[in-house]
Amino acid sequence: MKEEFYLAGKILKPKGLRGEVKIQPVTDFPDSYLERKIFYVGKSEEEAVRRTVRQAALRKGFAYLLFSGIDTREKAEEIVGFSVFVRSDALIQLPPDRAYLHELRGLKVLNERHEELGIIEDVLGMPAHDVYEIRAEGGLVYVPAVEEFVEEISIDEGYMVLKRFEEFL
């Protein structure tokens, strides 16, 4: 069975001479970089190699990691642009009112009367708040991911109820 991986960040550049790399986290929980001991690093999920974290730090919104087997600047330069993944079984347990992006993609979107309106294609990270990209009958519709418009989310049952959806058509 193929392991499932989820994107946790992108390697931006080496830092220093010992192989440390600067990473742009793609998570609402950057502190998890300080706690995790294992990441998978590669150009893609299929090419990802298991790496043990020897040292971790967070500074100004970036993670700085020193991986085993990457002990020179030259080796660090070889993985610049690579993605950093975590295995699905290593994801942090979220509180009931939170969900991972991969759990939201594909959810049915319903109105207050529970009539189907479309499917969530993606969740876009915007400066003010996330935005749901919904494939509806007339094309793509963008709805702010805020309480004012979200009545209910049921990951287990596979749907999201939106209020005032017609305002975005």
From Swiss-Prot:
Keywords: Chaperone, Cytoplasm, Ribosome biogenesis, rRNA processing. Gene3D superfamilies: PRC-barrel domain, RimM. GO terms for biological process: ribosomal small subunit biogenesis; rRNA processing. GO terms for cellular component: cytoplasm; ribosome. Pfam families: PRC_RimM, RimM. InterPro entries: PRC_barrel-like_sf, PRC_RimM, RimM, RimM_N, RimM_N_sf, Transl_B-barrel_sf. The keyword Transmembrane helix does not apply. The keyword Repeat does not apply. Its main location: cytoplasm. One of its GO terms (molecular function) is ribosome binding. It is found in: Cytoplasm. It comes from the Bacteria. Residues 96-168 form the PRC barrel domain. NCBIfam families: 16S_RimM. Binds ribosomal protein uS19. The PRC barrel domain binds ribosomal protein uS19. An accessory protein needed during the final step in the assembly of 30S ribosomal subunit, possibly for assembly of the head region. Essential for efficient processing of 16S rRNA. May be needed both before and after RbfA during the maturation of 16S rRNA. It has affinity for free ribosomal 30S subunits but not for 70S ribosomes. PANTHER family: RIBOSOME MATURATION FACTOR RIMM (PTHR33692:SF1). Belongs to the RimM family. This is Ribosome maturation factor RimM. It comes from Chlorobium phaeobacteroides (strain BS1).
